[in-house]
Amino acid sequence: MTGIRAQLWIVAFGFFMQTLDTTIVNTALPSMAASLGENPLRMQSVIVSYVLTVAVMLPASGWLADRVGVKWVFFSAIILFTLGSLLCAQAETLNELISSRVIQGIGGAMMVPVGRLTVMKIVPREQYMSAMAFVTLPGQIGPLVGPALGGFLVEYASWHWIFLINLPVGVVGALATLWLMPNYTTRTRRFDISGFIMLAIGMATLTLALDGHKGLGLPPLAIAGLILCGILALAGYWWHAKGNSSALFTLRLFNNKSYSLGLIGSMSARIGSGMLPFMTPVFLQIGLGFTPFHAGLMMIPMIIGSMGMKRIIVRVVNRFGYRRVLVSATLLLAVVSLSFPLVALMGWTLLLPIVLFFQGMLNALRFSTMNTLALKDLPNRLASSGNSLLSMVMQLSMSLGVSTAGILLGVFAHNQVVTNTPATHSAFLYSYICMAIIIALPALIFNRVPADTGTNRNLPRASAKAANR
């Protein structure tokens, strides 16, 4: 194995660990709740803590890699992720599990962006597409096997193993990084620590406020304090960034209409879409009485639909345009999402994989189109900052979505659920109705996309062949 090929394998395993962990936990939440003696309706904090940490730490990852070197940052990311996994497996209370997920999230936040940067450093630019296709393939496999693997481990072993399986991969990856990966550094500008702290406080406090009453049991006064603190922190960042060329994210990004619409639309849309991976396995297990493994297998059609749609997205957008694709996909996703509990509660369980397949297709169509809309017209000097802000907003909105789903289910179930009962069915149905409305609302934003927004081109055949080697 050549040196470069070995280094690409290291990055690929990092991608696999991170993407696997984003999906493997969802199926295990009801079993975790039973083991820890917790209400299943409080378990969304296990997901929120991880995703929110990733969102907060993302802006610092690229700067750290440039300053300290990709080798040491990637090594530290793997160590933190592996240590967090070990602590998660040893957790005996929900608070211990949440704290361990924060450690995991710090490692996960650095793993993927630093991995991309590593690939840029170790391969010639003309081979970058082929190299990225190689390292991201395991990352595509992670979400495909994650739900089923998580369900299998929970059903036939225990939920602790969804974290313990990271240990051997992490140890091998860390040793391989020390042995094989070169340490590239780059001269960097001074890091905007003030802006970073204000954004981190704003994101964390507002998300905690949303999750505070149902998930954390905070009193109303504490929640009001968190909201006020979050608003002041974000307002402070806005004031700090005005006319500041060294700000973490320049406000000049919002002078670009496509970027503004894409970013705002992406955040609002991902709040709705972020509810689905959390609610689906919980509904299947608590609402319908499925086993964890069965619920995990049911998630596979959604991933297959998502992967299949990615192959034809460019043709669909070129044929119908950004505005029509985004508005139509958003409204259709709302309808399909609401049809999922309706089909299930009418007893047509054989149709559920088909519904989930279309849900995955529509999600992929909307995600890819939103991302392209946001970045396609940015000038080169703003591309890096714009992409980093978009990545952060994507993670933040997912955490907000999971928190919102947990709140809805807690409100309609009155914080008590019994598996596969009429009262539980009603709670899930009302929650899905609200989710469908939230999913549909971003269509109002996407309807403002100019009708003449430009088209896209497929990759040349030669490049496509290179990417598939």
Swiss-Prot record:
The keyword Plastid does not apply. CDD domains: MFS_LmrB_MDR_like (cd17503). Keywords: Cell inner membrane, Cell membrane, Membrane, Transmembrane, Transmembrane helix, Transport. It holds the Pfam family MFS_1. GO terms for cellular component: plasma membrane. Gene3D superfamilies: MFS general substrate transporter like domains, Multidrug resistance protein D. The keyword Metal-binding does not apply. GO terms for molecular function: transmembrane transporter activity. It is found in: Cell inner membrane. The chain crosses the membrane at residues 8-28, 45-65, 68-88, 102-122, 134-154, 161-181, 191-211, 215-235, 263-283, 286-306, 338-358, 392-412, 426-446. It comes from the Bacteria. It is a multi-pass membrane protein. Belongs to the major facilitator superfamily. TCR/Tet family. HAMAP family: MFS_MdtD (MF_01577). This is Putative multidrug resistance protein MdtD. It comes from Yersinia enterocolitica serotype O:8 / biotype 1B (strain NCTC 13174 / 8081).
